[in-house]
Amino acid sequence: MSRAAFDRWISGLKPTGIEVIDGLRRAQAGKLDDADVKPGEAIRFGGYGEDRTLYTQTLFAPEGEEPRTVHLGIDVFAPAGAEVFTPLNARVHSSRINDNPGDYGPTIILEHTPVSGLKFHTLYGHLDRDSLKGLKPGTAFRAGEKFAELGTKRENGGWTPHLHFQIILDIGSAKGDYPGVAKRSERDHWLSICPDPAKLLGLP
């Protein structure tokens, strides 16, 4: 799918009132490496295009290679157990438990076709394991329907509880996983196929 077609669609998208996580539109924005949110506190979000220093695991920085530090999605920090809702009508593309240290943990990728000829995917990382139980490719969800919950640090790849939300215009052959962090030298390429999700999430 072309970036131009997506940009035309997203530019005309009207607010839906749907929040991927309850309270997102009242959330605090900011540069985030880590943000522990307790129950009852305002949730926090940020991270698209950030060049981050916290990715020290071998997954992101193999010895002798350029590290991956540029974040390709938006992180929404909320307590473990927070419900996750799809922003658009969707079908399950794939799911997987990515259990390397620092990885996504339980992950779901949804497929969206909001208008004829336009198809893209959204990735939801750091979920709880129960979110994947009984989930099959092709399972349909209506816009605003709950389909997952955030996982604890023990099951979400070792991170403070949060949702990694990412738009993917070119999924290729990927299933249940997709790069969420890019090398600086490849920044422009990856940001072109993983555009800023802010408008889809109803954020400024």
Question: What does each model-found stretch correspond to?
Answer:
Residues 74, 106-108, 161-163:
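Short beta-strand micro-motifs in enzyme catalytic cores
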